[in-house]
Amino acid sequence: MEIENHKEEVPFAHYEVLFRALNPQEVLSRLPDTQWDGAEFTLRLLGREFAIAHPGYAIRALDGGAVPPLPTQTFLLRYLLEGKNIKWNGQWKTFREMPWGEMYIQPYTGRVLTRAAFTFGTRVAAFCKASEKMGAVKLPHGDAGYQFELVPSYRMQILVWEGDDEFPPNAQVLYSDNFETGFAPEDRVVAGDILISTIKANF
């Protein structure tokens, strides 16, 4: 893969190199829901299963659909390299409530909360239809709300409120409490970004 000085391609190339040296058995010991058949890892992201070849990287969707964009593929590589299987204790956290949340809150607000508000709060019906198409669980909160499984054991909720003449649209994203120790803060930002992009792709 020829790499240009690009904000998406350079991180991907970095993790692709690390991925080549990955020990599959070590991955299985950390991520028991991930499968390995001697040639490919199989893992689930937002209800879809993907096969990732190792050591020479290649990705395919088991449903025959499109493969995810490069930032999502980078996230999956980081998950295979560093992911942890941590039990969810049944609590929900905002991004700000988790470690380092205050430090990352400005980029998070722009990339996730504001984007979700104006993408979904202005098209609530489309948001509901796309979320249900993805198999999300409907929630009784907000003008519309759904719960998703990002990767096994890690859940996210998006709640949206429609705007009106007086108030702009609004959104909140909640994370299962195991994100606190299971993902670095920058990966929590990316997780929100991936969730919004995936829902929007199902409009």
Stretches with model-predicted labels:
Residues 27-55, 137-162:
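Amphipathic, interaction-prone secondary-structure segments
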Residues 104-108, 112, 116, 141-142, ...:
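Domain-length accessory/inserted modules outside core catalytic folds
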Residues 62, 66, 117, 144, ...:
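Short, charged/polar micro-motifs that form catalytic or ligand-binding hotspots
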Residues 67-89, 176-203:
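Ampiphathic alpha-helical segments that act as solvent-exposed interaction surfaces
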Residues 1-18, 38, 56, 65, ...:
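Charge-rich alpha-helical segments
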Residues 122-181:
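Conserved binding-pocket/active-site segment within a compact domain
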Residues 48-74, 161-186:
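Intrinsically disordered, low-complexity regulatory segments enriched in Ser/Thr/Pro
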Residues 1-39, 72, 79-134:
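Short Lys/Arg-enriched alpha/beta "domain-start" segment
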